[in-house]
Design a protein with these regions (language model features):
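An acidic/histidine-cluster motif and surrounding catalytic segment
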Residues: 2-209
Length: 209
């Protein structure tokens, strides 16, 4: 109920603001940071529980038109304002850009960045992903399962931010403390880099003898 109430209030407040394109429902940063307002503006959209407007969904680009040009011009790096986040997103965008792929959530992420959009992210958790427990899931979703049953929170009053302002540090906090520790692509990359460093260390010791 709190999620729907939150959505109703923010859908109404930002119904005419084309820059705001999605309302997220999940929040995983309570142990890392406290907020005075009821939500902040993010460039990381979540598909666990979300809402949008007809005007925003009309911008959905399943064909990801102009993706390669945007990537090559550095526009994705510029949008996310953090190289680690942009590299991570590009790895998914590359896959979603395949003709045989139908990852709508990543195509929607591209639609948001293509239009320089923002997402509203609550500062209290409003949704759980129950799909982990009752249905087969992909490896990617399974990696996030430890965050699927966060305690749901209620709110009686919504405190709006004074202005629409994006702070990249919130997304960096989410990336480093949640995404980077759960996404199998990043975990595998970290393992590969660790093995490479270990091999390099052994070879250096061997050559020193």
């Amino acid at each position: 109920e709190s999620f729907f109430n939150f959505c109703a209030l923010t859908l109404e407040k930002y119904k005419s603001n084309e820059k705001i394109m999605q309302i997220n429902g999940s929040f995983h940063l309570s142990q890392f940071k406290s907020f005075d307002e009821s939500y902040y503006f993010s460039k990381l959209n979540s598909c666990w529980g979300w809402a949008t407007w007809k005007r925003a969904w009309e911008m959905f680009d399943a064909d990801m038109i102009g993706y390669e040009e945007s990537r090559d011009r550095g526009e994705i790096d510029k949008y996310y304002e953090n190289r680690q986040i942009s590299n991570w997103m590009i790895s998914y965008l590359e896959e979603a850009n395949s003709p045989s792929c139908g990852i709508w959530s990543t195509q929607w992420s591209y639609s948001i960045l293509k239009n320089n959009g923002l997402c509203i992210n609550p500062t209290f958790n409003l949704v759980n992903n129950i799909g982990f427990f009752d249905a087969p899931t992909s490896g990617i979703h399974e990696s996030f399962s430890s965050y699927s049953d966060y305690m749901l929170e209620n709110f009686s009053h919504i405190e709006h931010p004074d202005e629409i302002q994006y702070d990249v540090s919130n997304d960096v906090l989410e990336f480093k403390n949640i995404i980077q520790l759960t996404d199998p692509r990043l975990l595998n990359k970290g393992l590969i880099n660790f093995i490479k460093r270990a091999i390099k260390t052994v070879l250096n010791l061997f050559h020193e003898r």
